[in-house]
Regions:
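Juxtamembrane boundary at the C-terminal end of a transmembrane helix
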Residues: 2, 6, 191-203
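Structural signature of hydrophobic alpha-helical transmembrane segments
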Residues: 10-25, 77-91, 143-156
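Hydrophobic core segments of alpha-helical transmembrane domains in multi-pass membrane transport
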Residues: 13-21, 53, 59, 86-98, ...
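Generic transmembrane alpha-helix signature in multi-pass membrane proteins
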Residues: 29-35, 99-103, 115-118, 123-137
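Cytoplasmic-side transmembrane-helix entry/capping segments in multi-pass membrane proteins
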Residues: 43-55, 81-87, 108-120, 175-180
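Ordered, amphipathic secondary-structure segments that act as subunit-interaction surfaces
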Residues: 66-114
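Transmembrane alpha-helical segments of integral membrane proteins
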Residues: 154-170
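Interfacial loop-to-transmembrane junctions
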Residues: 165-184
Length: 203
């Protein structure tokens, strides 16, 4: 029982860590291009996007964990690692596509099917997996960090979306309006997080 509670505690502690102190967007710049695309896109629900991203991260984590252990004994693990992890992401994406295709006639099924490529084929997914393996996370740490990274991405989307509404002031020079001021805002938020965690990442 103690082992189970300890594993659950590790899972949630790494999830919280990934949401705030090690936010994929603000500390490593993962998925920024996709985030900028989401802001202002009323066709794509940020909530459904984050849900698919979280599911993808959690499903990829165990696959990448065991695949990483398998290739560790190979002659060139560093060269194989990105290819193997891309294959893990592809397998999970195919599984999600099959499930959503079967449910496409149900409520939100078609919308989720359209969002799936945006959420699954994302540098945030592959980058998070590479961080997990580079830091030699355990299985529960990897899954918790994956879930937290997805939730942290949602937090970043919400913050940038709110900023997009507020940064339409006439006081902002025309040359900075739109994407430039959005990137400046993301940079300021990243610096604020560095103020809590220090310049180097804490993992």
């Amino acid at each position: 029982m103690n082992d189970v509670m300890q594993a659950v505690g590790v899972f949630f502690s790494y999830a919280v860590l990934a949401v705030f102190a090690q936010n994929a967007v603000f500390t490593r710049g993962l998925g920024v291009s996709r985030l900028v695309q989401l802001v202002g896109d009323e066709r794509t629900s940020s909530g459904w996007f984050a849900l698919l991203l979280c599911v993808t991260q959690v499903l990829v984590a165990p696959l990448a964990f065991y695949a990483g252990g398998f290739i560790a004994a190979r002659p060139n693990p560093a060269q194989l690692r990105p290819l193997v992890f891309l294959a893990c992401v592809a397998v999970v994406s195919l599984f999600e596509f099959i499930v959503l295709w079967a449910a496409r006639g149900k409520r939100h099924g078609g919308q989720l099917l359209r969002i799936l490529p945006l959420a699954a084929v994302n540098s945030g997914v592959l980058g998070t997996v590479l961080v997990e393996r580079a830091q030699s996370f355990t299985l529960e740490q990897s899954m918790g960090f994956g879930l937290g990274s997805g939730l942290g991405y949602l937090l970043a989307v919400m913050l940038v979306t709110e900023a997009d509404r507020r940064l339409r002031s006439e006081a902002i020079p025309e040359a900075f309006r739109g994407l430039p001021i959005t990137l400046v805002y993301i940079g300021v938020l990243a610096l604020a997080i560095y103020g809590f965690t220090g310049h180097s990442v804490i993992l």
